[in-house]
């Protein structure tokens, strides 16, 4: 009996060792596999990484909110669309649409430059003038350009002998985009329209204005007899609002408005 007990004890001890191997990731006598995906240390490292990533995401969200709030505040001060410094030049063009009155100092400088007889300054010269005048008040490049256009047209009207004696060099002018467009129509060379008679008259006040009569198709295209069958397409030019388009069309006498009419199937 004693010998039998001694034989059972080694067997039991061996069996317990196998169970320990099974639990710790080994293979038991039954052939089952027990595998751990990661150790406790690896699991703890992964948990810390996830926590760090979560903190980073929260900080990124806070930074985005802060930057958005700053941009909104800057946009409110700068006019919304022009908060970007790259858009500052467009901002000058937009402010040119507003009514502008030169200060006495600005007007004196403008008159002095105009009296030098250089005509309408170049783009770079206008930029330099604007920079100089900005020291004496608010002004944009478009304001300077419009002022020289209007001043030149007014000087031409005076040369025609119909100018009012009350209009002196010190009078104040208000520049608008509509005024600039009107002046462009007045100074438009009528000879470019291809009209032999000029179609200009004097209203008795010294102001030479262009008539609202639409140019005749046969006068506009007299150099292209081959397109006489397509002259009916020029009826759209009878609208007075499109007269400024006619001036652009007549800039080059050799330009044929109907070079590609047949390509688009409009020749009828």
Curated annotation (Swiss-Prot):
DNA-binding region boundaries: 95-159
Subcellular location, record wording: Nucleus
Record family assignment: Belongs to the WUS homeobox family.
Domain of life: Eukaryota
GO cellular component: nucleus
A Pfam family: Homeodomain
Gene: WOX13
CDD domains reported in the protein's UniProt record: homeodomain
Protein name (record): WUSCHEL-related homeobox 13
Gene Ontology MF: a single term: transcription cis-regulatory region binding
PROSITE patterns attached to this UniProt entry: HOMEOBOX_2
Keywords per UniProt: Developmental protein, DNA-binding, Homeobox, Nucleus, Transcription, Transcription regulation
PANTHER family cross-referenced by the UniProt entry: WUSCHEL-RELATED HOMEOBOX 13
Main location: nucleus
InterPro entries in UniProt: HD, Homeodomain-like_sf, WOX13-like
Biological process, per Gene Ontology: callus formation; fruit dehiscence; fruit replum development; regulation of DNA-templated transcription
Expression sites (tissue/organ): Expressed in lateral roots, cotyledon and root vasculatures, pericycle, stem cells of the primary root meristem, leaf primordia, flower vasculature, stigma and gynoecium. Expressed in developing carpels, floral buds and inflorescences.
Feature: compositional bias, Polar residues: 1-19
Induction of synthesis: Induced by wounding.
Residues covered by region (Disordered): 1-23, 152-179, 191-217
